[in-house]
């Protein structure tokens, strides 16, 4: 193949390769990760209802949860860098150095990797990390070795937790000064002295005079729960340790053992499930103790040796799930500061018998739930004048009168759920003017009159529930913000005029039948933002909803519908201009017309951002179902069987939402869905979850559980459409680019093409030096010929070491006799590695010198990196007289100019400089 044709072929091949790489890059990038889920809790907080993943923390939104992790680096490589919550589950014995350095925004890290070793630089770069958890959920503890300085770089760490790990082989671990919560649950602690070995900065020296260590962390909470070998605390084991909270749930350690431990300033102590049988009196030594949790123990009597332990600073006391049957007289007198008392799940029934002396001016919260109470006697709570919350759920109370609640004028929350209440007596809330929250779920009420809810002036949250039917009569409280109504059979609103719920923001209805009487009356919800409907299909019919919601819901943002039966649903969304989240569950769309129904349902809510579809029996999906959802950011399919993905859904890929989840979805085995795999793994802007483990079935009786991707790889042609698209795209792009390169108006494109051509020329492996006959072409005029031949040429052509040994091309010497000078000049300059122009006033006046300078300038611009131009000034000249001087000034470097005028440079120095520049030009050309 001729040389010119070979160069053109290489150039075209270069274009094809570059375009192929660009195309593969554009279509191949994705952040879909096997066994990982990426979620934005700010976008859809209810996602965990459909897909379980690790818990987050308040204020954190972008979450990544990965399971079956074996290669940590490979898994983390595709997790978004701005992840705030990262949960990892799998098998990674050793955490390498800088394992999480990419995640500068990470604030919560939960590791369930069965890790046995952590290096000193594992967590380097996590300056924002606040929560760090090491979890091992197994009956036996796992040994974990921690380098002493492994947490040194975590300057913002506030919570550190170890669950199911033994730190036996670790010691002298540095804890950041920002640490506030330390947890060692279900570990191998046998005594408190182990803490001093593990974390010496926590404890002061055991000398009699405590010296606070500068920079030591100040713990608010120390959780040592379920350390089954921790049975006693030795003398001064915790000497000098200052804590707000100490949690010892599930340990055999008795509270009495803490007396001589040296623990200072304890505010909260939890001894849940420790097996104690009486309220410890020895803790009164902690005069600042404010909270004590003694739940799930064996306490039958609060009395101890006939006296009640006195906790003068105690504000919270929990005795839930014990065996209490009575409360001693003057019980609250010994707790003058008590504000919250939890006595739930005891045996204080059937009648609440409170001692006559039981009163408190500070008690604000009282929980008497699940105590088998049948009645609250008149005035039983009248002495609790400051009570704000009263919890009586799960008892057997059948009725309450205003005398039962007399004296509770500060009460704000009243919970009477899951009782046997059948009738509400008139005025029973008359003594509760401050009530804002009332819970009557799970009762046996048959009707509720609005007049029965009178008394509270600012009732905002109301929950009503009945097993059979529930009739609701006006007037309802005008200040309601949240209303939840449940009835097993029917909810019936009996109204006489279109009285609106002016301020209601959250409405939940759960029933089989929803009725509104009289039929021609409507209810208005102008402020409704969240609507939840649960029940049988006919409650969701268009006719029912239009009667109940006849006008627009202008502020509705979240609509949740969950059906309880398998009948078809006739549903139509209307008048919801601000709907952002739509959740549909168990609405049986018949597969024959499923696409049409879903399309009709969604076309009225084009502003939708989150769409969750569960148990809908969709059977078939096509692009027409979602083409109206331009703002969709999250799409979830849950529990669908034999789902067919129409191939025209590929048209929807450019506007596919940012998150697409498939949870427990079974597809049909058909090649029409072959595009799913390439889309799921190469989706440029979409995270896809659940497809890699989805199965497909050939028919209704197929139980083979064939993986969808395995079926597509085995039975369907792979990638034919993609490569066809890629080929046509490249050809079309070539037809566009090639004319532009030759267009004179697009000179920058021509220069870019030249640069690519040069790089490819070198990549093709050409030995450029072998293609040149001369090292330097010298351009000069006749007046300067004598100086060139006598002074310049001998220095450059002389053999080393005296000279450089360059091959020079001189027009007067090397042009063939009888050859055309123009052709010889063009050919010679093209075969020379560099061009040296000797410039004087006579040279600038010479047509041939000007022509040679122009030709050399052209080669310099058209072939950058492969040709060089050197200018030698023998006399002072105005450089503006040079042809295309401004272009030359951009392309030439400082070392490309040589000035011998007026003896500015010594001859020897000039020769050395010229030799070095010519030698460097030769190396660059090679």
Swiss-Prot record:
Residues covered by the TIR domain: 772-922
PROSITE patterns, alphabetized: LRR, TIR
Signal peptide location: 1-30
Chief subcellular location: membrane
GO biological process: inflammatory response; innate immune response; response to bacterium; signal transduction
Localization terms from the record: Membrane
Top-level taxon of the source organism: Eukaryota
Residues in compartment: Cytoplasmic: 743-926
SMART domains documented for this protein: LRR_SD22, LRR_TYP, TIR
Single GO MF descriptor: NAD+ nucleosidase activity, cyclic ADP-ribose generating
Extracellular side: 31-721
Residues annotated as glycosylated: 46, 73, 342, 396, 402, 506, 520, 620, 699
Transmembrane region(s): 722-742
Entry's Gene Ontology cellular component terms: membrane
Gene3D superfamilies found in the cross-reference section: Ribonuclease Inhibitor, Toll/interleukin-1 receptor homology (TIR) domain
UniProt entry tagged with the keyword Repeat: yes
Pfam families: LRR_8, TIR_2
Function field: Participates in the innate immune response to microbial agents. Acts via MYD88 and TRAF6, leading to NF-kappa-B activation, cytokine secretion and the inflammatory response.
Protein family per UniProt: Belongs to the Toll-like receptor family.
Subunit structure: Binds MYD88 via their respective TIR domains. Interacts with HSP90B1; this interaction is required for proper folding in the endoplasmic reticulum.
Stated name of the protein: Toll-like receptor 11
Gene assigned in the entry: Tlr11
């Amino acid at each position: 193949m001729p040389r010119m044709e070979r160069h053109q072929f290489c150039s075209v091949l270069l274009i094809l390769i570059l375009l192929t790489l660009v195309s593969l890059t554009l279509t191949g990038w994705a952040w879909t990760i096997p066994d990982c889920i990426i979620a934005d809790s700010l976008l859809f907080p209810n996602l965990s209802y459909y897909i379980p993943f690790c818990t987050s923390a308040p204020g954190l939104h972008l979450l990544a949860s990965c399971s079956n992790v074996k290669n940590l680096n490979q898994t983390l490589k595709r997790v978004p860098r701005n992840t705030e919550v990262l949960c990892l589950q799998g098998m990674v014995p050793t955490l390498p150095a800088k394992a999480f350095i990419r995640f500068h925004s990470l604030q919560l890290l939960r590791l369930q990797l069965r890790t046995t070793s952590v290096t000193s630089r594992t967590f380097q770069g996590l300056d924002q990390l606040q929560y760090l958890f090491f979890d091992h959920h197994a009956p036996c503890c796992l040994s974990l070795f921690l380098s002493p300085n492994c947490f040194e770089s975590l300057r913002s760490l506030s919570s550190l937790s170890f669950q199911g790990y033994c730190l036996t082989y670790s010691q002298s671990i540095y804890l950041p000064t920002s640490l506030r919560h330390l947890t060692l649950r279900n570990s191998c602690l046998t005594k408190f002295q182990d803490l001093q070995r593990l974390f010496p900065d926590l404890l002061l020296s055991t000398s009699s005079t405590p010296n606070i260590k500068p920079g030591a962390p100040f713990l608010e909470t120390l959780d040592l729960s379920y350390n089954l070998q921790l049975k006693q605390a030795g003398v001064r084991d915790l000497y000098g340790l200052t804590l707000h909270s100490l949690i010892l749930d599930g340990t055999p350690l008795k509270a009495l053992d803490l007396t001589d431990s040296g623990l200072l300033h304890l505010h909260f102590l939890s001894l849940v499930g420790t097996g104690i049988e009486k309220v410890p009196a020895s803790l009164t030594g902690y005069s600042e103790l404010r909270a004590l949790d003694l739940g799930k123990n064996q306490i039958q009597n609060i009395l101890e040796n006939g006296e009640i332990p006195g906790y003068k600073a105690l504000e919270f006391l929990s005795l839930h799930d014990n065996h209490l049957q009575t409360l001693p007289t003057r019980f609250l007198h010994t707790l003058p500061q008590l504000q919250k008392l939890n006595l739930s799940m005891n045996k204080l029934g059937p009648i609440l018998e409170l001692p006559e002396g039981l009163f408190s001016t500070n008690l604000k919260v009282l929980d008497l739930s699940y105590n088998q109470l049948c009645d609250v006697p008149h005035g039983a709570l009248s002495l609790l004048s400051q009570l704000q919350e009263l919890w009586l759920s799960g008892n057997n109370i059948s009725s309450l009168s205003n005398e039962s609640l007399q004296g509770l004028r500060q009460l704000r929350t009243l919970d009477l759920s899951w009782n046997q209440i059948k009738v509400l007596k008139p005025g029973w809330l008359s003594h509760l003017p401050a009530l804002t929250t009332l819970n009557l779920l799970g009762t046996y009420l048959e009707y509720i009159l609005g007049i029965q809810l009178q008394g509270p002036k600012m009732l905002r949250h109301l929950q009503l529930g009945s097993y059979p039917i529930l009739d609701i009569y006006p007037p309802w409280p005008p200040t309601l913000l949240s209303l939840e109504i449940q009835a097993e059979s029917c909810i019936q609103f009996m109204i006489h005029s279109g009285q609106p719920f002016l301020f209601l923001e959250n409405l939940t209805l759960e029933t089989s039948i929803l009725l509104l009487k009289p039929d021609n009356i409507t209810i208005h919800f102008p402020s409704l933002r969240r609507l939840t409907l649960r029940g049988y299909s006919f409650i969701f019919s268009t006719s029912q909803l239009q009667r109940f919601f006849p006008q627009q819901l202008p502020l509705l943002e979240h609509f949740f519908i969950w059906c309880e039966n398998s009948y078809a649903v006739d549903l139509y969304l209307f008048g919801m201009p601000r709907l952002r989240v739509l959740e549909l569950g168990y609405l049986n769309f018949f597969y024959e017309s499923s696409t049409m129904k879903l399309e009709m349902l969604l076309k009225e809510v084009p502003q939708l951002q989150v769409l969750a579809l569960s148990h809908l029996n969709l059977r078939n999906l096509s692009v027409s179902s979602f083409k109206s959802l331009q703002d969709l950011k999250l799409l979830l399919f849950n529990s669908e069987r034999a789902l067919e993905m129409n191939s025209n859904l590929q048209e929807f890929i450019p506007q596919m939402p940012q998150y697409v989840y498939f949870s427990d979805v079974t597809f049909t085995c058909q090649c029409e869905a072959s595009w799913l795999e390439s889309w799921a793994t190469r989706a440029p802007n979409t995270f896809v979850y659940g497809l890699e483990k989805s199965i497909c079935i050939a028919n209704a009786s197929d139980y083979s559980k064939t993986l969808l991707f395995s079926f597509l790889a085995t039975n369907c042609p792979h990638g034919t459409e993609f490569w066809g698209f890629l080929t046509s795209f490249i050809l079309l792009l070539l037809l566009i680019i090639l004319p532009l390169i030759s267009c004179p108006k697009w000179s920058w494109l021509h220069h870019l093409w030249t640069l690519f051509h040069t790089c490819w020329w070198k990549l093709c492996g050409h030995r450029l030096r072998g293609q040149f006959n001369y090292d330097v072409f010298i351009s000069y005029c006749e007046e300067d010929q004598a100086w060139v031949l006598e002074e310049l040429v001998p220095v450059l052509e002389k053999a080393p070491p005296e000279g450089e040994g360059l091959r020079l091309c001189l027009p007067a010497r090397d042009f063939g006799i009888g050859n055309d000078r123009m052709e010889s000049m063009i050919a010679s300059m093209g075969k020379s590695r560099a061009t040296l122009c000797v410039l004087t006033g006579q040279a600038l006046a010479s047509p041939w010198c000007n022509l040679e300078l122009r030709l050399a300038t052209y080669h310099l611009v058209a072939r950058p990196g492969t040709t060089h131009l050197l200018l030698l000034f023998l006399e002072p000249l105005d450089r503006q007289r040079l042809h295309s001087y401004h272009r030359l000034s951009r392309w030439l470097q400082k070392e490309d100019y040589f000035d011998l005028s007026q003896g500015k440079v010594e001859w020897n120095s000039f020769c050395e400089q010229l030799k070095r520049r010519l030698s460097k030009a030769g190396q660059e050309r090679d």
